[in-house]
Amino acid sequence: MKKVIVTGGLGFIGSNLIKILLKKKYFVINIDKVSYSSNFYNVKKFSNNRNYKFFKIDINNDKKILKIFKKYKPNAIFNLAAETHVDRSIDGPESFIKNNILGAFKLLQAFRKFVERYKNSLLIHISTDEVYGDVLTGRSKEEDAYKPSSPYAASKASSDHL
């Protein structure tokens, strides 16, 4: 059975990804630090599923993250863990820098150590369209220049470049 880790799995997108992965018969490990945007209701339907495990861990804790990687040996890791509210980022950018930049860095460092031994795993980092700034016409493309207009967008752009 393939194993997948989802960080930020108590959020809206993360919990829906977990739902899809469980339907496809993956073993899913949900890692979430549990913050203002976490919602246990999102995972209530599958919290007793034998192919689902939840761990309350901050991605800044690279030692615990690496321990989980080594224990479960995931085929893939989806990083959806992030502070996500634009207005909150303006009022207090520090947690966005800590979680979205440093947290992504710590997760990447743990992943680098993990893949030294387990080479067949991949990490998929999830971003946001906010990194492109205000798109007035049409849609943004991946090749477009970054123009973040909030601390949230800047923190996600920074993590993309790691």
Enumerate the language-model features and the residues they cover:
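N-terminal Rossmann-like NAD(P)+-binding domain of SDR-like oxidoreductases, especially those catalyzing
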Residues: M1-L162
